[in-house]
Amino acid sequence: MTTIRLKENEPVEVALRRFRREIERTGLIKELRARTAYEKPTTERKRKKAAAVSRTRKRLRSQMLPKKLY
């Protein structure tokens, strides 16, 4: 469970922002959204494979040099 401690004289809005950032970093929101509905194992594998291909293409695109620089 994610917890934060309020610092002395810290506004609630700032503490809430820190809490949201911490939740985002741990991936809790993403996991909760994934668990709202059942996903078949084949669909999950297919989705993860597509994400991996997308990440690889993005990485390759960033490493490629432009054809001409003029």
Swiss-Prot record:
It holds the Pfam family Ribosomal_S21. GO terms for molecular function: structural constituent of ribosome. It comes from the Bacteria. One of its GO terms (cellular component) is ribosome. Residues 39-70 are annotated as: Disordered. Residues 45-61 have a biased composition (Basic residues). Keywords: Ribonucleoprotein, Ribosomal protein. GO terms for biological process: translation. PANTHER family: MITOCHONDRIAL 28S RIBOSOMAL PROTEIN S21, SMALL RIBOSOMAL SUBUNIT PROTEIN BS21. Belongs to the bacterial ribosomal protein bS21 family. HAMAP family: Ribosomal_bS21. NCBIfam families: S21p (TIGR00030). This is Small ribosomal subunit protein bS21. The gene is rpsU.
